Amino acid sequence: MSQLHSVIGFAILLCAGCTKTANIPPADLTLTSFERGASHLLTARFTSTVDLQHAFNDYEKSNQLSPTLICSLNRDLDFSSEHTIDIRAEGRVTAISETRPHHTFSSELVFYYTQPNGTQRDLNDYEAIRPLLASQAAIPCKVRITAYGYEAYYTNTLLIPSRLMTGQMPR
């Protein structure tokens, strides 16, 4: 059994070395609006200097998974794929306009709140999240894009004013 574990461990080490860093330029994001959408989820609209829907295809000739907007609600700035932000908002990024040089996107956000004991509060528990937002001027967000064989790509930070976010939350 230990020989099998050694082989598996060696294979993991080999595969870990297989991931490449994508040659995608850093994308600057600019918030254009933040409002409650038709599905009653809070929706961020923003522009990007990189076409987030086709970044890996444009720069690496590789397919990618759907981009995700991730916002840290508890001042946790570790956006790496090896780490999960316990109190966050995230949503799939969809294209609204792909006119160059600024592509426009939106993301309907779902709010997650994992307590210190590991249990999850109800999704979109705004009453638990509102006090965290009130203590901050802005909420940092990044778009993450993944593709097979590549390290996750992250955009530059988008700051959403916390007042704007709390103002759109249902009471």
Residue spans for each PLM region:
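Bacterial N-terminal signal peptides that target proteins for export
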Residues: 1-7
